C-alpha cells in the first residue's frame, strides 16, 4: 500500500555491519529455564596464548582449558572472564580476558559452558548468504581480538560448510536489526556447539 513501510524490502536492501565479537551466549535451546550460569575452569600457569572475551575455549589433556583452535574438538563454550592473583602485585585480579603468559597457580576461567547454550556469531563470508546455511555445520575462524577492549573477533568460517563433523551447528539467523540480512555479507548466525565436550557422543580427553 502506498506510503506503507515495507520492512521486507528495506531488510533486503540492507548490508550487515562488519563487527565480529566471537561467540556471544544468548540463551538455551528450547523452553527450559536458563540461569546463564558460568562454569569455572583452570588455565595453566604461564600459558602464552591470549584468550579474548567470547573466544571459544576447549579442554586439554592436562585438565585445563585454552583458546580453541580452528577445527579443534572438545569445545566447552566461550570465555566470559578470568580471576587470578597477580604475580607482581599479589592482588586478586578480575579481567574480561586472559592476557597470556601469567605466572599464577590460581588462574580461573569463567565459561558459558552449557552444551545446550545458543550463541550468536558473525560469518566471515564476504558475499550473500542463503537460508540453506541453516542446519549446516561449520568451523570457527580464529583471529586476534580487539586490542582496545579485548573482545574476540573470531568468526564462523563459512568456507567450512558441511553436513559432516564441525565445531558449530547453525540453528537460525540472528534477529539483530543490523546483522540479519541473509542476502548480504557478514550475517550473524545463531549456533550451538556441535563438538561439545559434554555431548554424550564424545569421549573423554
What residue spans do the PLM features occupy?
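Catalytic phosphate/metal-binding cores of nucleic-acid and nucleotide-processing enzymes, i.e., regions
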Residues: 4
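Surface-exposed, low-hydrophobicity beta-strand/loop segments enriched in small/polar/acidic residues
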Residues: 8-205
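Extracellular interaction modules
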Residues: 1
